[in-house]
Amino acid sequence: MKLKVACQLVYELKENAPLILMLRPQNGLEQQILEENFVLTPNIPVSEYQDVYGNLCQRMFATLGKLTINTTSIVETQAHVEVNFDAGFVPVENLPNEAIIYMLPSRYCESDKLFSLAFEITQNLPLGYAQVDAIRQWVKTHIVYEYGRSSSSTSAFDIVQTKTGVCRDFTHLCLALCRALNIPARMVVGYLHDLKPMDLHAWFEAYVGDKWYTFDATQNSATGNRVVIGYGRDANDVAFASQFGDMELVNMWVSVEEVK
């Protein structure tokens, strides 16, 4: 499927300040960038680098006043995600080096505190994909999707207590529960077609059966039509904007449309 994805951010700056964005989709095996535009108003210099997770980051020094960022991409992506209940657990000693970091606790994913819950959810299941899907289903069933009940400091352990959150919180809890079972799991941010209400979205991938599989605890089924922007251990690694001065995000607009 071809998708046209777009995002506009409008900032008001009270001072000149550095700003780092993560808004450009990745170009790889699962998705191909066919067209892309990245426009700043005013037209200030931008440099780009690749972070340690392979994400594209746009770095700039924004000036006092209004800054508008418009990014648009046409992307060829997968209409469905792969489902494979035969994908088994990969012993730690057999994991690829790059997967190890996604097995450890992180800022928002206190997997060391959640082993008992992870074991309770997955006991008597085959090791691997079936465990991850059981975790996804448990979070979808037991956590209420609700805006305004969590904040940027809310962690996976917090969500177990409050049982409310948004896609970022659902994802953090799934990550922590998978890692508690020594299953590498990483956060993914990007776009999802037909998401309601439309916004940038977060989901996760787990490493079982010697590859990464996609899961989303906010959805009823394994839906495709996703465009990946970035990967990380948790939200700390994949913020769409990291600001280093006195500025305010006054407007944000996101769009995902199918291209016939």
Q: Can you annotate each of these PLM segments?
A:
Residues 1-81:
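Intrinsically disordered, low-complexity N-terminal segments that are enriched in acidic
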Residues 28, 88-104, 155, 222, ...:
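Flexible glycine-rich active-site/ligand-binding loops centered on an Asp-His dyad
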Residues 45, 91, 141, 155-156, ...:
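Glycine-rich, flexible loop/turn motifs
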Residues 46, 145, 160, 215, ...:
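Short clusters of hydrophobic/aromatic residues that line enzyme substrate/ligand-binding pockets
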Residues 77-92:
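Ordered, amphipathic secondary-structure segments that act as subunit-interaction surfaces
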